[in-house]
Amino acid sequence: MGTVTWEGVTLSAGSASSGSSPSAPATFAFRFCLNTSTVRDEQGRSRPLRELIRIAQQAGYEAIEPWTHEIEAYLSSGGTLPELRRRLEDAGLKVADLIGFAEWIVADESRRQKGLEQAKRYMDWAAQLGCPHLAAPPVGATGGTSPRDDPRHSHPVTDLLAAAERYHALVELGKPFHVVPLVEIWGFSRTLRRLGEAFFIAAESRQSQAAILPDVYHLYKGGSDFSGLPLLAPTAIGIFHFNDYPDIPRDKITDADRVFPGDGIAPLRQILKTLKTLGYSGYLSLE
C-alpha cells in the first residue's frame, strides 16, 4: 500500500524513496489515536482499561487517549502504573494524552490551587506512562454549562490575559514531568469556546511549549469556523480531536450528537488539507 486517500486527501506524507522496495509501508501524514470515551458501553460507562487496550490494538490504532478516572479505576483494582505501561507497550500502543478535569483556570485562588495539585497528580501519572500531554479544558469556569461544574461556583473567565498567566503556571507545573498541558476548547462553555481564545491564552502564556487541543465538533459548537487553522504552527497543536457533526444549528447541537468522521457535514477535507499543509504530523484522536 503506497498511499491512503480519504475525503479526497492523500494521507501519506510522500512516496517511498527511489531506493525503497515498492512494497515499503507508507509514511502517513498523521498518526491515529482512540479517545477512550468513543467506546463506552450502552449505559455510557467507561470500559476497563484492559478492555480498552485490547479494542485499540485490534482496531489498529497507534495510541490511546484515556481519561483519568479510568486510570483511577485501574489503580483501585490493584493495578500499578508500571504494569499498565507494560500492557500498553506489549500492545504496541502509546498514550498520546490524558483527559482530566483539574480547575486550573478558575479565578478563585483556593479552588485553583486544589486544581493545580490535582493536575500535578495527573502529570505524574502521564510521566510514568510515557505520555507527553495532559488536556486542560476550562472545567470550573464554563458558567454552569458543564455537569462537571458546580453551577453555584462556575464563573466564566473573561480576562484572557489572566487565563494566560494561569496557563503559564500550569505549564511550569508540568516541566519536571516533561508533560505539556494542552489548552482545550469546549464549544459549550462560556470560557474557551473559540479557537481564537485558546490561541490567545497559549500565545500570551510566555511559554514556548504552549499548545492547544482543537476539536472538530467543539470548534463548530463554539462558533469558530475552520479558516483560522492555517494561522497555527504545527507545534502549537498538541493533539487534534477528530469527529463529525450532523446538520444541527450550533445553539441546538450537543456533545451527544457527534458522529463518526464522514457521517456528518463538517468540512473534514478542508481540515485535513490544512493540517497537512501546516506540516502537522501528530495524532488525530477519534472522540
Q: What label would you give each PLM region?
A:
Residues M1-G19:
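N-terminal export signals
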Residues W6-G8, A24, S46-R54, P82, ...:
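Active-site acidic/histidine proton-transfer and metal-coordination neighborhood
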Residues A24-S46:
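Boundary/entry segment of secreted carbohydrate-active catalytic domains
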Residues A26-F32, G60-E62, E89-A96, Q128-H133, ...:
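Short, well-ordered coil/turn segments that N-cap beta-strands
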Residues L34, A56, I64, L88, ...:
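Conserved, mostly hydrophobic/aromatic
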Residues R40-R47, W67-T80, E103-A107, Q113, ...:
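Acidic-and-aromatic substrate-binding clefts and catalytic sites of carbohydrate-active enzymes
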Residues A63-I64, V95-L98, A164-I265:
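Acidic/histidine-rich catalytic cores of soluble enzymes
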Residues L75-G92, D97:
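Aromatic-lined substrate-binding rim segments of carbohydrate-active enzymes
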